[in-house]
From Swiss-Prot:
Protein role: This protein is one of the two subunits of integration host factor, a specific DNA-binding protein that functions in genetic recombination as well as in transcriptional and translational control.
PANTHER family attached to this UniProt entry: DNA-BINDING PROTEIN HU, INTEGRATION HOST FACTOR SUBUNIT BETA
Transmembrane segments: none
Subunit relationships: Heterodimer of an alpha and a beta chain.
Source organism of the structure: Shewanella amazonensis (strain ATCC BAA-1098 / SB2B)
Gene3D superfamilies in the cross-refs: IHF-like DNA-binding proteins
Record protein name field: Integration host factor subunit beta
InterPro entries xref list: Hist_DNA-bd, Histone-like_DNA-bd_CS, IHF-like_DNA-bd_dom_sf, IHF_beta
Annotated CDD domains: IHF_B
Length: 95
């Protein structure tokens, strides 16, 4: 599901809100989440999951085009850990 599909689905389910209001709310929520992670804070949405930053240590990588070794710096990357309710709902799906 893309962001625009999410906005469309929410606007359909929340008929009292216009599509523009839903779009604004979704964009603001995502912006706040990004800002919170950017400041190094953790985000927890009970039943859904938590977002945090994990440190990825410096390592030697490989340029896939040329095959040469490249030194990659350490960095923080976003990490999502699903909550219990979300895990149970996904586990219940028979694919």
């Amino acid at each position: 599901m893309t962001k625009s599909e999410l906005i469309e689905k929410l606007a359909t389910r929340q008929s009292q809100l216009s599509a523009k209001e839903v779009e604004s709310a979704v964009k603001e929520m995502l912006e706040q989440m990004a800002t919170t992670l950017e400041s190094g804070e953790r985000i927890e949405i009970r039943g859904f999951g938590s977002f945090s930053l994990h440190y990825r240590a410096p390592r030697t990588g490989r340029n896939p085009k040329t095959g040469t070794s490249v030194e990659l710096e350490g960095k923080y990357v976003p990490h999502f850990k699903p909550g219990k309710e979300l895990r149970e709902r996904v586990d219940a799906v028979n694919v």
